[in-house]
Amino acid sequence: MKLIFLHGLGQSAESWKEVRDILTDYPSEAIELFSSEVNSYQKVKERVYQHLAQETESFVLIGLSLGAALALELSSYDLPNLRALVLSGCPLKLSGNILFYVQLLIFKLLPKRVFEKQGADKALMVGVSEELKTLDLTDIAGICPYPTLLICGSKDKPNLSSMRSLHKLIS
């Protein structure tokens, strides 16, 4: 079974290199979510869906943070070869999430060079975060038909509550 990795916001497909290097017994692919032509969550979702819909072998979708939210959302699409999900640090509902709004405000206030030092694009991060302000995957999580492994570190305070809620909905 193939493993398909989706990275988080501010990261790249290269972020999964060490994990993929360890899992050499499994065919795998890390999808680059953003490019100069694909710079919004909606465009990413459509492009990744088109890619996954053409996948000819069974696969597990593995996502971190934004990639986990995307994986969960895509689980509600018609993907005949999708078999399971692995979600790490998945935001369930950003709509009304005070910490998320504070993060977005900080993104807007930070100078561009701070993002560039991290290899990130400020305009992209602010734009995608603005788009995600209304994200609410509660309904999708409640009907997710796939076996799902949820992963969240005990010190990941911003995501721990969300992952606990997700666990209740998926179980």
Regions inferred by a protein language model and the residue ranges of each:
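Flexible "cap/lid" loop of the alpha/beta hydrolase fold
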Residues: 76, 82-112
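Conserved HGGG/HGGXW glycine-rich cap/lid loop of the alpha/beta-hydrolase fold
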Residues: 1-37
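Conserved acidic catalytic loop of the alpha/beta-hydrolase fold
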Residues: 42-59
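Gly/Ala-rich beta-loop-alpha elbow adjacent to hydrolase catalytic centers
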Residues: 63-71
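Conserved alpha/beta-hydrolase "acid-adjacent" motif
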Residues: 157-163
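Active-site nucleophile elbow and catalytic-triad environment of alpha/beta-hydrolase enzymes
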Residues: 124-140
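Short beta-strand immediately N-terminal to the catalytic nucleophile in serine-hydrolase-like folds
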Residues: 61-63, 88
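Short beta-strand/loop motif that positions the catalytic acidic residue
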Residues: 143-144, 150-152
